[in-house]
């Protein structure tokens, strides 16, 4: 009988944290996922340790547990993890790990990540550019514009979209939005999906119209329209909490459109 069969099931934060220190790689991977899925803040320190655990390495050179620990830390959004995540950026053997770390830092949103991320962008070594540019957009590092503009002509269309997303958020110029919208009709299904997620991150009225017209499953449209709606409503709540609520006509119209579109899509599912 294998160790996985004999192991206790992970049903509590304590069991998941204990499993991270075990020997079974599959169980340790699942434990990291479980802690992130359930946003167990008590698991932050254990996940930071797992971020540097090199015991689980696949033949191609990647570190699955370390990647999953990074993703889980992003889900926790705990600023205490930032120093460990920044240190993990130094791993050069696994760009998949670096990508997961960059995404986690973007989710946490701590400004301490800005300098090391800009350093990666300026490096002459290959980087997970899509995640890196998206993180700089999320953190609103607008000073990186001169370094990011050339990526509009990168060989990867997904990297091009990330650069267009960054530049649209900075300038609101429609040509950058159009670069993303064009990919909604791409022959590659995954590029269409990536484009729709990029549009949802922008939350623009034209992005809503483009998503509704896109050649993607209704379930994917619904997911991303809900993301835009939640972003707009969260902004309203934030303004109310600060006593500054003043919703403009454009936002009101977009919210009404989103509610109607979501209702229509739910009926069609």
From Swiss-Prot:
One of its GO terms (cellular component) is phycobilisome. SMART domains: EZ_HEAT. Gene3D superfamilies: Leucine-rich Repeat Variant. Keywords: Antenna complex, Lyase, Phycobilisome. GO terms for molecular function: lyase activity; oxidoreductase activity. An enzyme involved in the biosynthesis of bilin. PANTHER family: DEOXYHYPUSINE HYDROXYLASE (PTHR12697:SF5), PBS LYASE HEAT-LIKE PROTEIN (PTHR12697). Belongs to the CpcE/RpcE/PecE family. This is Bilin biosynthesis protein PecE. It comes from Mastigocladus laminosus. The gene is pecE.
